[in-house]
Amino acid sequence: MTPTYMNIMLAFTISLLGMLIYRSHLMASLLCLEGMMMSLFIMTTLIALNTRSPLINIMPIILLVFAACEAAVGLALLVSISNTYGLDYIHNLNLLQC
C-alpha cells in the first residue's frame, strides 16, 4: 500500500473518530462527515485514474453529487435547529417533528 493511500485512509479514520467523539453537536458531525466524503472522493478518483476503466470514471462525480445533497440537507437542518432553539445539539432533531 502506497503512502498516499495510507494518508487518505488515515484521514477517513480520523474523520470517523471525530464523528464518534463529537456526535452530540450537529456542526461538528457535519464537518466530520464532509471530511469522510472528501477522503472517499479522493480515494475513488485515484482508483479511477489507476484502473483507467471508462465505467468507473463516473463514480467520483456521483459521490460529489451525493456529498452536495448531504451538505445541503445538513445545513438546512442546522439552520432550522439553531433558529428554533439556539443550539446545535443533535437531540433537538427529535423536537422538530410535527
Swiss-Prot record:
It is found in: Mitochondrion inner membrane. Keywords: Electron transport, Membrane, Mitochondrion, Mitochondrion inner membrane, NAD, Respiratory chain, Translocase, Transmembrane, Transmembrane helix, Transport, Ubiquinone. GO terms for biological process: ATP synthesis coupled electron transport. The keyword Transcription does not apply. It is a multi-pass membrane protein. Its EC number is 7.1.1.2. InterPro entries: NADH_UbQ_OxRdtase_chain4L/K, NUOK/Mnh_C1-like. The keyword Plastid does not apply. It catalyses: a ubiquinone + NADH + 5 H(+)(in) = a ubiquinol + NAD(+) + 4 H(+)(out). Gene3D superfamilies: 1.10.287.3510. It holds the Pfam family Oxidored_q2. GO terms for molecular function: NADH dehydrogenase (ubiquinone) activity. GO terms for cellular component: mitochondrial inner membrane; respiratory chain complex I. Core subunit of the mitochondrial membrane respiratory chain NADH dehydrogenase (Complex I) which catalyzes electron transfer from NADH through the respiratory chain, using ubiquinone as an electron acceptor. Part of the enzyme membrane arm which is embedded in the lipid bilayer and involved in proton translocation. Core subunit of respiratory chain NADH dehydrogenase (Complex I) which is composed of 45 different subunits. Belongs to the complex I subunit 4L family. This is NADH-ubiquinone oxidoreductase chain 4L. It comes from Macaca maura.
